[in-house]
Amino acid sequence: MEKVLVFGHKNPDTDAICSAIAYAELKKELGMNAEPVRLGEISGETQFALDYFKVEGPRFVETVASEVDNVILVDHNERQQSANDIESVRVLEVIDHHRIANFETSDPIYYRCEPVGCTATILNKMYKENGVTIRKEVAGLMLSAIISDSLLFKSPTCTEQDVAAARELAQIAGVDADNYGLEMLKAGADLSGKTMEQLISLDAKEFQMGNAKVEIAQVNAVDTNDVLVHQAELEKVISAVVEEKGLDLFLFVVTDILTNDSVGLAIGKAANVVEKAYNVSLENNTATLKGVVSRKKQIVPVLTEAFQA
């Protein structure tokens, strides 16, 4: 049987990795020869989850067409966030919870996108719909994805469906969602030992906003100053990325997991759009973004609107 690769976006977060594992497992149970892979390094937060539930991380690939003809995308749909040669393969399915942009296919496909906080929430439904029991380890990974995407249920992207799914999955996994979740988020907020290049690419995504090419990277921290003490070095590596990719804006967002506020570091010729979007003034290229924790709901649509205004 021909193999199908299942993967999340480049610079994968916990949902991208864990949903690839969970959906590949469901597809295997349903008779498909599916393998989860990843398009980037595994973060400290994700590694904590994998270690805790004793699951091996997926192997790394940059391109897929040399291996398979068909792929399944989870936690993304935009071409620039996917495998480098995504145009050379057929996308069979997409399971996602983001905006739909820069995506088209030549054939009809199974496309499931729901306005929930996490792909794993959708997968929890799909396991039930197909009558497949979720293994304890996989339930733990799916729970980890929901906790990560919802910042332990505090993000505005978090829905009642996400909370309900997390409670169900925690029961299967045999953990207390709140205690485990805080441990996991703290592991993810430990940025010690990371280079500046790693910091700005840990969780970075490119977007087309009107005519502007924008990259938004986000890291979580227990204290934003722990990251911003390196601002001069960060600006240097960000400026290099802006030049290399021809970006109009690179927004580096440092989110405080205790206060649920963020600080944005904006570099690029369109940095002023951040000021317009949030009604703030950039001082030394930074501004506090009060109550902003979600790239998907509080940054991408706000900036997109500002660029198109």
From Swiss-Prot:
GO CC, alphabetical: cytoplasm
Catalytic reaction list: diphosphate + H2O = 2 phosphate + H(+)
Cofactor: Mn(2+)
Pfam families the UniProt entry points to: DHH, DHHA2
Cofactor note: Binds 2 manganese ions per subunit.
Keyword annotations of the record: Cytoplasm, Hydrolase, Manganese, Metal-binding
Species: Bacillus cereus (strain ATCC 14579 / DSM 31 / CCUG 7414 / JCM 2152 / NBRC 15305 / NCIMB 9373 / NCTC 2599 / NRRL B-3711)
Recorded name of the encoding gene: ppaC
Similarity remark: Belongs to the PPase class C family.
Protein's name according to its UniProt entry: Probable manganese-dependent inorganic pyrophosphatase
Cellular compartment(s): Cytoplasm
